[in-house]
Structures are given as C-alpha cells and as structure tokens.
Amino acid sequence: MSQNLFAVMRDHVVEALRALLPQLTPEQVARVEVTPTRDPAHGDMATNAAMVAAKPAGQNPRSLAQSLAERRGAHPLLAGAEPAGPGFVNLRLSTAALLGQIPVILRAGEAYGDGSVGAGVRVNVEYVSANPTGPMHIGHCRGAVVGDALARVMAKAGFTVTTEYYVNDAGGQVQALGWAAYWRYLQAIGSPITAEEFDAATPTGLQYRGDYLIPVGQALSEQFGAALATPDLGVAEPDLWFDRVRELALSMMMTEIREDLALLGVRQEVFSSERALLESGAVDRAIATLDEKGLIYEGVLEPPKGKTPEDWEPRPQTLFRATEFGDDVDRPLRKSDGSNTYFANDIAYHADKIARGAEVMIDVWGADHGGYVSRMKAVVKALSDGRVPLEIVLCQIVHVIRGGQPVRMSKRAGTFVTLRDLLDEVGRDAVRFTMLMRKSDAQMEFDLDQAVAQTRENPVFYVQYAHARCRSVLRAARDSPGAAAIEATALAEADLSALDDPQELALIRRLISWPRLVEGAALAREPHRVAFFLYDLAGEFHMLWNKGRDDSTLRFLQAEDVVGTSARLALVAATAMVIRSGLFVLGVTPAEEMR
C-alpha cells in the first residue's frame, strides 16, 4: 500500500472526475485537492474537485459533488463519500484502510514520509551568511534553524539539496574588523592607548568592542610580538600589519561561527567567499552578461522618496534595467567613481550559483533585508532567462525574555544575546524546536523559562516526552515475562483488529497525514509545519496514554491479551517512528527517556 493515502485518493478522485468530464484541461485538474477534514465527524478527507470543475463544465457544483460521491463511495479504501456544503465531497476511510497503514509505517521506518514531489530538482538553500565580524546572535540562530530544517524537509520530499553559507569577507565591515582586532592586539602587548584614542585615530572608528576579539589580539601578540606596533606601542602604518591582522581575525571568527553552527546541529556543505568571487573577476563577468542582454545603461536615477539608499547619487552610474523584471526602479551596479555597488557583488554570487547547476535558489534572510528582495529576484530572472527562480524566506526578529522581562545583553558580545549564550542556557533541542513554533515571517518571543519547563506549554518537552513514553512501552514489552516481540518486522505482521477505540483511530489518522505534511511543508517552504504536526501528534498519543490509565482495556501491555498487546505495540512503534522521523527533519534529538 502507498505511504501517502491522500495522494492515492486524489488520483482516484481525478480518475472519477475525468470519467465524468473528459473535456477538463490538465490545468483545471491540477487544482483538485484532497485535504484532511477539520472535523473528524465529517470524515477523514475532503476534496474540492466538484467546485473546481463545475464552472468550466457548466454544472451545478452540488450536483457534481453528488455524482462524484456516488462514484467514489464504492472504492475499496472508503467506507463512504458524501457531498457537503456548496460542493465539497467528504471521504471516510474504512477501518481496514487506516489499520493497513500501520504495517506500511513499520516497514518503512524513519523513511516513512519520504516523497518524490521534489523529483530530484537541484535546490540551493543559502542561510545564515552572517558577517564574520563577531559571534552569532539570536537573529542568526533563527535563520540557521529555519534554513537547516527547510533543507531537511525538502530533501525528505525528494529534492536534491545543497546547503550554503556566503562568507561576506570583503567590504567595509571586514575593514572595521581588522582595525578592531588590531586594537585588541595593542592591548595584548601592553599599549597604553585607550579605546577613545584608538577610535579617533582609525579610518573606520572602533566599531566592534566586544570581548570576543580579545583572543584574536592575544593570538596576534603570540605570533608577532610587538612587531606590528610602533616602538612606543602605538598605531603603526596599516601597510605593515593590516592584511595579516584581518586574515587572522577572519579565520578565527569563521572558526567560531562554524563551531556555533555545529553546536546548533547545522552543517553546511558549501562556504562561498565573497572576496574569492571578486578576485576571480566574477563581478565583471556578471555585468558583461547583463550588458550582452541589453540590460545595462549609463544614467542618473531620480532622487528617491523618503530615506536615501546608500547606492544613490545624483551623478551618472552604471544601471541595471530592473524595472523590466518587476522591480520599482532600475538599480546601480557601478558608482560614478567606477567602484562596484554591493548589489553588483550579490549579482556575481547568484550568477555563480546558477553556473554551478542550481535549478531553484532559496535565500533565508533577516526581515531587515526585505527591501532587497525585488531587485535580487529581478536580476536572477534576467541572468537565467527566467529558468531559475529565486525564493526569499524572511525571518523576523526574536525577543528573548526571562520572567516576562527582556534579556538584552551578553557580557562577551556587549550588545546582544549570542547563540552560544542561548545554547548554554536551554540546550540545542529546545532552541531548534522553539524557533520553529512560529512561522518565520512572524516576530517571536523566546521564553527562557518556558524552554526548560517540563509542561505541555514547552513543545520540545511535550514531543520528546511522547517519544520517550513510546520507547518505555517497547522496553517494558521486551523485558516482560512474556517477552513480546517488539521488532518492526514482527509487529508489521500483527493482527490489528483490536485497534478499534476512537482514540486509537484518531492517532492513526494523525500518523497517516505525515507524508502529505512533508510534501506540503517542502512545497510551501514552511518547515514550521513539521513542528506543529509533531505537537499535535504528541497530543494524540498522550491522550491515548491517559485514557489507558482510566480504562484497563486500552493499556498497551496486557498479559492476558496477546493479540491486543501486539496490535497496540505496533501502534506505539509506528508512533515512535513517525515522531523520530519528524524530529530528524527539525534536527532535534528523539529522547529515549526523560530525566
């Protein structure tokens, strides 16, 4: 039997619809959906097929729904089909169809839910890409978790996924990092210069003052002694030291960022250097490609309304015809002095991803970059002749609270809560799951107290507890005097007829929606759907557990009922497998027991 009963039923609904209305076009049929009903009293699934087809067929949707229900009611997986509302058809699965999915889950194991909707399409998911000028903070954390979970759910749905980090190792912020690291070096060798004096003496100002650069200064001191300073331990000419200081600072910052990502459970496959792209001539090549397409011209943009962008100037610039691809205004690529804009560098980077074979590009950005979306989509459309879509997932700000009050400061970073602070406080699993309990474009509060609470209000505890309970039942069965079989292969052959309680069937209904959930989350680029699903699944299992405490006939292990015990163990094992599969997508550990 197929893993995805919703896909099976959609195929049958479409078959019936085509038999009734052979004139329907593929585009019209593509709009047919089979979805879970909101109220189980109305059945297990509902389809909009009659409402989709009624208008082009010139029929009444309610009458068409009645005809479809009559055709579908005889299907072997269905116990019934009824028209509903203005033209929906509610479908009720047979108990045999529900029970038949338990062996499917047990035989598939954690691969249950693996799909083919991605069809091997090559997707590049770029996320985090934090400037290597300091430790990762809470905002980077959300983007890292969202991007990583998105990549995982898309891979499970059948896409070929590459995960990537763009290292912004060129430009003004890296220059400022070099100067800030040099100040920490001067401190390490005993220079009397103060922060205020150094700030006034540098071209960038002292922009990064957190303690995290102290180890960089110490490393420079150990490597070079006082050779990078003046004889009186003052600021030497940058030609003497700047490149060496910047390179060591960048290397140490990227090492720390990689360590933070590893602690968070994020391991990206590709790290692309902005500076390497610039040095390879990629920007010139990308601009030349646009020029060959007739999309470059010299001109002066109208003064912008409101806040003036960094790349606007009242002089001729090299401009990209972004308005031809849906943007509000044309965009500068080169300034009047001949230097490239940051947009030009980003064009080169995305052109490189296209050249490496990406068929879909997904960038996960902070919401503060929302104004950049239209220009990047425009230029990717231009570069790829519309073949490669660029999708942007925006992550809103995260507020950390404790005791109802905001937590703002990190001693080490100076001005923000670092990822390391958060991981030390509540652990990786709580961080990852909590970050996915809101849609990425919604602001969220991360409550430190709730993240460690052993209550239903803490979603990671609630879901891990359900898995731990499943595992405890299976261990108890293994260690019982009767030593019931708990291997998936054996349980897949169990007689499941004893599973007839409404709560047992409700749990099965939740389990069988997992393949559809994976497909939907991947196509919508919404990994938070997995977290919501797991929370609801855990709730169904906990309800069954609690019901068994009050009704002895629903207890999982009953020495006098071997057949019933095997059936319930099969259900418990299937539940554990689906929870484990979902937690893998989220990058969260499935707990064997709660401590």
Predicted regions and their residues:
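Short, charged, solvent-exposed linker or helix-capping segments at domain edges/interfaces
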Residues: G100-I105
